[in-house]
């Protein structure tokens, strides 16, 4: 037993010494600067792109990627990157392709320490492009406003996505870990999928909306969905304020749902296993709310025919006629008033 314990402690000591050595080596290669500006392992580049293109594909391993409108009418790519992962730029068949070339040695692969952040910033001179496709592993992504894209597809492993532009036909964002923020005046079909992270939509107009997440909060403010909106989640709250849609559906397992000034032309439904549902001045052609554990309370703007059921909980709803409002809870009170 003592021999096993001694061997374990020896292995731990070796691991600590190895990590300390990697730390010192990386700091030395960064010119003994924690901001990495003096590092010999990094390089700053600036490249002007003169060929014409209508589509853009970006696949880099920099920490941060930004796509911005060009203020001087010049298409330009600025990067600060590791020398072992340089980028390449080419225009083929009307498509601008920006990608990295993997040249990592063993040290770069096993070293966990990084004292500087790399980035790539693309400045676009036009105000409309057919497609923007971005593949990114780790780092934040910004797509600034001022440019229209017909179609946008973003795939990110770890990092935050901020999309402030317009995707006229469709917008698809897929992330594993990180927050997603969207502000768009005119976007078509919007599909957002994330495993862990918050999703926020503000001051936006989309044709349709499909949100799917496992863990995280959904917040929508001043949002217009011209057709159907679907929000699916496992754990996390949903907060909607000043939202309109043709049909609105919220389905999740755990988390509170708060709706303020939310309107659906045809059908509005909420399905929740655990969590409160709070309504403040909402309305729809038909309303369906079903929860297992959690109360349903608030106000509806117009009179409804209430069909309510609670296995364990107090019920207090108006005796009015109108379109159907069906509310069911297993454990939780139901209290609804008409008016704001």
Give the ranges of each region predicted by the language model:
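Acidic (Asp/Glu) and glycine-rich low-complexity loops/linkers
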Residues: 1-60, 64-156, 162-175, 181-194, ...
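Structural signature of tandem-repeat unit edges
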Residues: 163, 240, 259, 279-280
């Amino acid at each position: 037993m003592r021999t096993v314990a001694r061997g374990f402690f020896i292995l731990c000591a070796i691991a600590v010494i190895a990590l300390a050595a990697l730390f010192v080596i990386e700091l030395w290669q960064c010119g003994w600067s924690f901001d990495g500006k003096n590092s010999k392992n990094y390089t700053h580049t600036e490249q002007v792109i003169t060929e014409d293109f209508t589509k853009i594909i970006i696949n880099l391993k920099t920490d941060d990627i930004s796509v911005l409108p060009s203020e001087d009418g010049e298409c330009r790519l600025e990067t600060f990157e590791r020398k072992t992962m340089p980028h390449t730029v080419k225009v083929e068949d009307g498509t601008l392709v920006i990608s990295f070339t993997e040249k990592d040695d063993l040290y770069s692969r096993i070293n966990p320490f990084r004292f500087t952040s790399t980035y790539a910033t693309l400045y676009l001179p036009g105000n409309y492009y057919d497609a923007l496709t971005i593949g990114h592993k780790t780092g934040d992504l910004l797509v600034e406003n001022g440019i229209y894209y017909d179609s946008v597809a973003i795939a990110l492993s770890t990092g935050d996505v901020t999309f402030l532009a317009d995707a006229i036909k469709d917008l698809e964002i897929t992330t594993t870990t990180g927050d997603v923020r969207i502000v768009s005046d005119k976007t078509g079909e919007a599909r957002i999928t994330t495993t862990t992270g918050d999703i926020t939509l503000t001051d936006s107009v989309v044709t349709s909306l499909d949100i799917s997440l496992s863990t995280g909060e959904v917040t929508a403010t001043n949002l217009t969905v011209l057709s159907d909106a679907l929000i699916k989640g496992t754990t996390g709250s949903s907060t909607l304020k000043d939202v309109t849609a043709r049909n609105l559906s919220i389905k999740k397992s755990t988390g509170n749902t708060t709706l303020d000034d939310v309107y659906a032309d045809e059908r509005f439904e909420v399905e929740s296993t655990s969590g409160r549902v709070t309504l403040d001045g909402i309305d729809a052609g038909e309303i369906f709310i079903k929860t297992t554990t959690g109360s349903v309370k608030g106000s509806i703007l117009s009179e409804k025919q209430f069909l309510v059921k609670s296995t364990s909980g107090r019920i207090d709803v108006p005796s009015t006629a109108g379109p159907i409002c069906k509310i069911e809870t297993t454990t939780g009170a139901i209290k609804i008033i008409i008016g704001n």
